[in-house]
């Protein structure tokens, strides 16, 4: 008997729970439960939530509707459910690349179509669609050749009303508070509607990306005598200004075109104030520094998706995107003297332009009554044009006006163009073996050529065969088991090919690039179970996974001499990872609170790889051992009010980083958040959100060694903590 079959059998009318069963219930959902009558329809492996299901909560947007469905709190931070803050995400090794790769998680579609773009997610679009335009929300747990996505554990399909003419305007105005008493306003306005065969969504957004961090660092020398202390304030005055559009036009009942675009300005200038106290002298010495880090970043994206359905039900689809990201930044470091004068001692200028062009075509047809096949090809071109210039007061080169008049410092691999051309033919077969059992199998053949020119010239060819099998068995309409086997080729970061700014270490200016980096690949095996409790009480799910990795990317020794020790991101060998994810989303009707939705997640995982410096088995770099999340949403419809909490905590003590001369491990305080939301009679929502109710310190311990890490000669031990402070915000949202 499987885990969830055993569990579900204990919930039949008249049954009694044994002590073992009670323990299992406690592990999976921390509480018992009873039925809650709600109006939902179950169509095989698809659960349908009509618009009437959400009436009592008076939602404003489609995102508000989705947040009320057990197991589907995809609202993200600031909209009631909340995803974890930065640094709390889990597995860093998952995910393929290209437009056809499924997320292995939850995909969101609108009217059966996904967004033809990478910088615009369908989940963010839900916050701009009025709830009055939603006909129903479908939770699709099966797989089919008719779906517009592949490989996802489930699909959320938001069906909009078909009206000849309709439109709505949604708006959001917000103010955010930072711990340095800075208040930053922002806002979003969106127009969405339909005119006959034409539908549209236009969005104008201006959001602050302001942050203020206080860093405290203390260090001792290798003989455990005091070394220094560092107090640093880092203020980033970032912004995110966007203009985006999503357009769709149905030429006929069987021919449709979707187009989307995005123009964005994401500048993030940063100022740093730093005071270093030298404890090795008497009296102590003070070094006061200021850093100015101007940053300008602009990007745009266009995407298109055309689909034609033939009379026999076969479909032709053509999809393409093009995007451009221009990121220019500088790092200027000044020493401030007692008379308040300053001297420039470091100037680092980096420019990076990243471009991507992808086109994908496919033809889907029925092979037999219960089988369909999709044949197609994808071609992608990705380029990075990177330039870096370094000037230092202590350099030996000639003064250069381009680096603030400082002596020029030569940096290896500082100016390069990296290009990848990838071609990927594929075949996908969907087979409904019987009403309860489906199998999706795919075979992709990837060929790619990576060339690098400039300071380094290199050209390499790669090819990978990527099969995947996804078997789903609906034991009952509410209980599904899913097993997958797939080979994944992880996307390379082209920034690892070239020299770059080192913003994690004040004692280092640049990171070296590696022109010989290869893709990290993995064979991944997973077993998933999902049990939907009767009468929409909630959802329980579990995933167990194991992965064999090849060419794991981590720090690699490329030193040419013992006096010039250098490490780069490189391929260090093979590794494994394994773990489990347990999820519960329960309505608390058993305690008289049917409108209290509790979501909890427990992730436990581990990994192993051979360390190239010490020759020992250890975890992947900064690999989380696990995490626990708990979020709640309590609706009080008669007051038009809801509130909730957010809690995220990692399993600390296991996140390590081994480098050629350093060793680091990180720990952090749990994240606590709380929100409250009230709606007036006009339908305007007022929301107070506190994303961090405590200090939320994230700490790092770094061991520096004299020479190689393997020599074991400790030079310095640093302990550094970053404090982000309480982060409240106030938001007003409405539609008309």
Which residues fall in each region the model found?
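C-terminal beta-signal and adjacent terminal beta-strands/loops
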Residues: 4-5, 651-656, 676-736
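Transmembrane beta-barrel wall of Gram-negative outer-membrane proteins
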Residues: 179-214, 225-272, 293-315, 469
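N-terminal periplasmic accessory domains that precede
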Residues: 62-65, 95-98, 108-109, 125, ...
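Short acidic/polar hinge/loop motifs at secondary-structure boundaries
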Residues: 115-141
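Outer-membrane beta-barrel signature, preferentially recognizing the C-terminal barrel domain
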Residues: 291, 295-299, 352, 418, ...
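Gram-negative outer-membrane beta-barrel transporters
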Residues: 545-548, 568-656
């Amino acid at each position: 008997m499987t885990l969830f079959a055993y569990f579900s059998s204990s919930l039949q009318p008249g049954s009694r729970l044994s002590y073992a069963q009670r323990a299992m219930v406690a592990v999976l959902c921390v509480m018992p439960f009873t039925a809650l009558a709600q109006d939902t329809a179950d169509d095989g492996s698809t659960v349908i939530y009509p618009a009437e299901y959400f009436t009592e909560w008076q939602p404003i947007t489609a995102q508000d509707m989705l947040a009320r469905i057990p197991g589907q709190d995809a609202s993200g931070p600031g909209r009631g459910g909340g995803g974890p803050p930065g640094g709390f995400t889990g597995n860093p090794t998952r995910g393929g690349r290209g437009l056809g790769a499924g997320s292995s998680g939850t995909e969101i579609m609108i009217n059966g179509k996904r967004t033809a773009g990478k910088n615009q997610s369908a989940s963010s679009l839900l916050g701009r669609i009025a709830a009055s335009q939603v006909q129903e929300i479908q939770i699709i747990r099966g797989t089919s050749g008719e779906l517009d996505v592949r490989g996802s554990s489930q699909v959320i399909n938001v069906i909009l009303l078909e009206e000849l003419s309709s439109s709505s305007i949604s708006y959001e105005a917000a103010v955010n508070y930072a711990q340095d008493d800075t208040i930053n306003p922002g806002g979003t306005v969106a127009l969405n509607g339909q005119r006959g065969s034409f539908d549209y969504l236009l969005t104008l957004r201006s959001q602050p990306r302001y942050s203020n961090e206080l860093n405290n660092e203390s260090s001792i020398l290798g003989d455990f005598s005091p070394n220094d202390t560092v107090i640093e304030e880092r203020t980033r005055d970032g912004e995110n200004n966007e203009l985006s559009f999503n357009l769709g036009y149905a030429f006929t009942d069987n021919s449709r075109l979707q187009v989307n675009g995005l123009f964005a300005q994401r500048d993030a200038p940063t100022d740093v104030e730093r005071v270093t106290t030298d404890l090795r002298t008497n009296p102590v010495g003070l070094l006061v520094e200021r850093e100015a880090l101007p940053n300008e970043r602009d990007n745009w994206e266009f995407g298109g998706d055309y689909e034609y359905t033939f009379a026999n039900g076969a479909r032709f689809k053509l999809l393409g995107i093009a995007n451009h990201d221009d990121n220019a930044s500088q790092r200027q470091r000044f020493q401030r003297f007692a008379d308040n004068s300053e001297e420039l001692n470091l100037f680092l200028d980096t420019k990076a332009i990243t471009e991507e062009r992808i086109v994908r075509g496919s033809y889907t047809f029925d092979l037999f009554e219960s089988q369909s096949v999709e044949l197609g090809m994808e071609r992608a071109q990705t380029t990075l044009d990177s330039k870096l210039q370094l000037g230092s007061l202590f350099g030996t080169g000639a003064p250069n006006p381009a680096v603030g008049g400082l002596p020029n410092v030569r940096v290896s691999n500082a100016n390069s163009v990296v290009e990848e051309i990838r071609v990927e033919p594929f075949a996908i077969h969907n087979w409904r073996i019987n009403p309860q059992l489906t199998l999706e199998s795919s075979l992709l053949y990837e060929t790619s050529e990576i060339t690098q020119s400039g300071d380094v010239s290199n050209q390499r060819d790669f090819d990978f065969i990527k099969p995947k099998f996804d078997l789903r068995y609906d034991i009952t309409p509410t209980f599904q088991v899913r097993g997958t086997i797939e080979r994944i080729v992880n996307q390379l970061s082209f920034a690892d090919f070239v020299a770059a700014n080192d913003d994690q270490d004040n004692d280092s200016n640049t990171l070296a690039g590696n022109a010989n980096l290869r893709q990290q690949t993995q064979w991944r095996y997973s077993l998933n179970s999902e049990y939907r409790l009767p009468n929409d009480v909630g959802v329980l799910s579990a995933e167990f996974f194991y992965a064999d990795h090849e060419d794991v990317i981590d720090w690699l020794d490329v030193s040419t001499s013992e006096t010039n020790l250098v490490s780069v991101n490189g391929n260090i060998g093979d590794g494994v990872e394994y773990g489990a994810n347990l999820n519960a989303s329960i309505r608390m009707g058993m305690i008289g609170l049917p409108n209290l939705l509790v979501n909890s997640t427990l992730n436990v995982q581990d990994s192993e790889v051979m360390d190239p410096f010490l020759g020992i088995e250890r975890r992947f770099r900064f690999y989380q051992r696990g995490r626990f999340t708990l979020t709640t949403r309590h609706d009080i419809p008669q007051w038009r009010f809801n509130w909730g909490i957010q809690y995220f905590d990692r399993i600390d003590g296991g996140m390590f980083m081994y480098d050629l001369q350093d060793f680091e491990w990180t720990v952090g305080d749990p994240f606590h958040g709380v929100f409250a939301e009230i709606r007036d009679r006009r339908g305007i929502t007022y929301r107070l959100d506190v994303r961090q109710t405590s200090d939320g310190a994230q700490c790092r311990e770094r061991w520096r060694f004299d020479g190689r890490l393997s020599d074991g000669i400790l030079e310095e031990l640093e302990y550094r903590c970053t404090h982000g402070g309480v982060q409240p915000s106030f938001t007003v949202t409405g539609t008309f």
